A protein has these predicted regions:
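Conserved acidic, metal-coordinating active-site core of Asp-based
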Residues: 109, 113-213, 219-220, 227
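Phosphate- and divalent-cation-binding pockets in alpha/beta enzyme and binding domains
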Residues: 27, 52-55, 131, 165, ...
Length: 252
């Protein structure tokens, strides 16, 4: 019998480990504890910011690398990877592997799109923490963390015409937009799948070849699910799946 390859799990947060409306993780607590006890790496892969993810890593007792802002960057704890990470920049207690465009580039693009199209785009940079909290149901402190963005700007977009115009102008500027659970996100072309591949390469170097599992709930997670060995699409509370996902085309 062959030796089983080490397991690495990648998971989205909102709607997957966290309940979509309340952001509670207690239904996942037993599984999270099991991963800690068995020392199975859990790599959080989310649209959330580094500051937001750090809160949940502490709650989960998680010490593994993590992916932020829809693949905008990978953060690797220096404590566990004490040698330089290829492509990484030392930032505090992490090696940061930047994969997306810097936030100031995105904000300049938003301003240009407004100028060229007349769209009344509003992003997190335009909102106070109180307004973000009202839109998302986050606490005020969590809303402040959500505004600490580095690689991705969530935008409030109304209607298909605005969405199409935004996407077209983003492409002209060398950027992309993707639809999340609540907002449209402007970013520099990075995605969760590309970030997952970078993390897998690190684990392959450390552990030899690994088996990867990806868990997500939305179309935004498809790049991650396509990059792993075992993809898992989570149902919504009503038992349905994200209607933007073609189940027949899901990777097997």
């Amino acid at each position: 019998m062959g030796i089983e390859k080490p397991l690495v799990i990648f998971s989205d947060l909102d709607g997957t480990l966290l309940e979509f409306e309340t952001y509670s993780w207690h239904e996942a607590a037993e599984a999270l504890g099991l991963l800690v006890r068995r020392r199975i790496p859990l790599v959080l892969c989310t649209s959330k910011t580094r500051s937001e993810v750090e809160e949940f890593r502490a709650a989960f007792r998680n010490c593994d690398p993590f992916i932020v802002e829809n693949g905008g960057a990978v953060y690797v704890p220096v404590r566990d990877w004490n040698r330089a990470v290829p492509g990484g920049v030392r930032i505090g207690e992490y090696w940061q592997i930047p994969l997306g465009k810097p936030y100031d580039v995105l904000l300049s693009a938003v301003a240009e799109i407004r100028k060229q199209t007349g769209l009344g785009l509003r992003g997190f940079a335009d909102l106070e923490a109180r307004q973000v909290a009202e839109l998302t149901g986050l606490s005020l402190e969590r809303a402040r963390r959500a505004k600490e963005r580095e690689f991705d700007e969530p935008l409030i977009v109304h209607g298909n015409e605005e969405q199409d115009l935004l996407a077209a102008w983003a492409r002209k500027l060398g950027l992309r937009v993707s639809r999340g659970g609540r907002f449209w996100h402007l970013h520099g072309g990075a995605d969760k799948g590309r970030a997952v591949k970078r993390v897998v390469s690190l684990y392959d170097q450390e552990l030899g070849s690994v088996t990867t599992v990806g868990i997500g709930d939305s179309a935004n997670d498809l790049p991650m699910l396509e990059a792993v060995d075992v993809p898992v699409l989570v149902q919504k509370p009503d038992g349905t799946y994200d209607d933007r996902v073609d189940l027949d085309c899901m990777p097997e």
